[in-house]
Amino acid sequence: MALLDIHGHIEFIYFDDLPAACDFFANVLGLPLVCNQGWSMIYRTSPTSYLGAVDRSQGACKATTRDGVLTSLVVNNFDEMHQRLVDAGFKFDFGPHYSESLKIKSMMFIGPEGYKFEVEEFLEPEMREVFYPTLK
């Protein structure tokens, strides 16, 4: 069976306060806005992956819970991201932590409107090849 010819991924997250969510994505995480649809704003997280912030009243889904998704951002600058989040006043549910068994740095925090976010950096050489292919 042939693989789908997938070129990217967008995760859409639904918000009651779209401007506050957009401020978080742009000014806290530092993500560039690549598509403004008015009620949906799409931010680039890597060359072919994106996060979309959607006005809950206009989106295609009737998102009723915020604890059904964990948005995990794979970074190559974990310590810098930690400091950026600290400077923005975020508290961490978990971490920052180094997992000896997984060979990752990880931290979790609650973002806008109660959504859970994880920031992680893979440290094992084999996993770095998988998750950081553009750094070769």
Listing of model-derived features with the role each one plays in the protein:
Residues 20-21, 78-82:
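Short, conserved charged micro-motifs
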Residues 30-36, 91-96:
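Short secondary-structure junctions
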Residues 1-22, 69-73, 123-136:
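N-terminal beta-strand motif that seeds the catalytic metal site of vicinal oxygen chelate
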Residues 21-26, 85, 114:
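Conserved active-site tyrosine of GNAT-family acetyltransferases
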